[in-house]
């Protein structure tokens, strides 16, 4: 039975997508939500086999997990079906497993931009076997660009549900014009956190290495469970080198992201 918050999981029977399923179930248990597990086949004759495989996946889960899952095997184009499901179901999160940004591109091809860039649904990307039954620390980078703080409400919502602290990390680049934008964004985010009673702290990195190296090392040092970072159509998820670095972080920290332009 579908109830919200709802976690949409595209599933291809790989170990990677199985990890995404486990993570989504943990989120559903903590937040009294449910999981929509979907597999897409290209032609109708493949549907019966996929349905049996999907049934076996669910049968191997605990009764408590099984109660939270609604499953569907759809026929069509995987990119289009994920988009349709997101539009109809309005999930709180799309939870996807990947080897990394290049892994997403390999699995979904260039059409991943159609799935993600045209949706205001936040995406949780996970690598490896991670757990989210407890989230204590969320690291959120931001810059002088207003789009960089569009992830704030989603990160704050997760922090409130888990009682987590958000570590806000400004990207300082010694450009005076940029510093003004960073200061403005910091004030906006701080006000939002205070008004919504979200625990947070400001973090100043040493600026001894490039920002993203220091950001990821910091996230690893504080044992962050989630990195929350936004993107826009101007810096697409699968091609932006900074987002690739965040997704491919050596600590395998799940990444919460959303298309800022679709939120306007």
Place the predicted regions along the sequence by residue.
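Intrinsically disordered or low-complexity boundary/linker segments at protein termini
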Residues: 1-15, 19, 117-151, 248-264
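Residues at the starts of beta-strands that form the adenosine-phosphate
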Residues: 6, 32-36, 68, 136-137, ...
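Rossmann-fold cofactor-recognition segment
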Residues: 68-71, 202
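Charged docking surfaces used in two-component/phosphorelay signaling
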Residues: 73-81, 207-212
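An alpha-beta-alpha
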Residues: 149-181
């Amino acid at each position: 039975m579908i109830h919200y918050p709802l976690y949409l999981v595209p599933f291809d029977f790989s170990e990677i997508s199985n990890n995404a399923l486990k993570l989504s179930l943990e989120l559903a248990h903590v937040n009294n939500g449910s999981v929509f597990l979907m597999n897409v086949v290209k032609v109708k004759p493949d549907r019966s086999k996929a349905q049996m495989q999907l049934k076996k996946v669910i049968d191997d889960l605990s009764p408590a997990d099984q109660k939270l899952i609604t499953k569907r095997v759809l026929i069509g184009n995987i990119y289009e079906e994920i988009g349709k499901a997101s539009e109809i179901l309005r999930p709180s999160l799309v939870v996807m497993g990947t080897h990394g940004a290049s892994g997403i591109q390999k699995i979904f091809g260039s059409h991943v931009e159609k799935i993600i860039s045209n949706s205001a649904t936040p995406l949780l990307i996970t690598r490896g076997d991670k757990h989210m039954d407890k989230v204590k620390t969320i690291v959120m980078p931001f810059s002088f660009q207003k789009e960089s703080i569009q992830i704030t409400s989603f990160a704050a919502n997760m922090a409130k549900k888990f009682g987590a602290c958000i570590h806000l990390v400004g990207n300082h680049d010694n450009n005076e014009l940029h510093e003004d934008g960073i200061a403005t964004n910091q004030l906006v985010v701080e006000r939002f956190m205070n008004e919504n009673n979200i625990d947070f702290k400001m973090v100043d990195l040493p600026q001894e290495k490039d920002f993203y190296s220091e950001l990821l090392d910091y996230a690893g040092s504080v044992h962050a469970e989630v990195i929350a970072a936004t993107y826009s159509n101007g810096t697409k998820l699968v091609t932006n080198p900074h987002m690739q670095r965040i997704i491919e972080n050596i600590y395998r920290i799940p990444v919460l992201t959303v298309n800022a332009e679709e939120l306007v």
